[in-house]
Every structure is written in structure tokens, then in C-alpha cells.
Amino acid sequence: MAAKKKLLAELREKSLVELDAFIHENKKALFSLRAEAALQNKVVKKHLFSMYKKNIARSMTVMQEKEGKIDG
């Protein structure tokens, strides 16, 4: 729980450009994880799928808060 709050605090300190880069990095990592699971038949750490998706959602929420679309 503390790690989530720490991540949210770090995300709120970032600028919109940095948030966009963070989202892009996480989407890229999620895509490569999906490709690895589908193509290489390797054992993939399944918890990483939800971690990346949640990080993307958190950062997009913070981005919308900064743009004024969400009251926060």
C-alpha cells in the first residue's frame, strides 16, 4: 500500500511531458510482455500484466487531474 502512495506522489510531481513518457514506457513494456508470452512460450510473470496496466491507469488519472478534467 505504501508503494502505491509513493508512486502516486512521484507521478503527481512529474510534468505532463514526463507523464506522457512514463505512460509510453509502460505501454511498451506491456506490449513486449504480451509478445513474449505469446511467441516464446516462456514462463512469464503474470503479475506484471496487472502491474503495468495499473501504472498506466494511475498515470493517466494524474494526467487528467493536471489538465483539469477531473476534480482531485
From Swiss-Prot:
GO terms for biological process: translation. InterPro entries: Ribosomal_uL29, Ribosomal_uL29_sf. One of its GO terms (molecular function) is structural constituent of ribosome. Disulfide bonds: none annotated. Gene3D superfamilies: 1.10.287.310. SUPFAM superfamilies: Ribosomal protein L29 (L29p) (SSF46561). GO terms for cellular component: ribonucleoprotein complex; ribosome. Keywords: Ribonucleoprotein, Ribosomal protein. It comes from the Bacteria. Belongs to the universal ribosomal protein uL29 family. This is Large ribosomal subunit protein uL29. The lineage of its organism: Bacteria, Pseudomonadati, Chlamydiota, Chlamydiia, Chlamydiales.
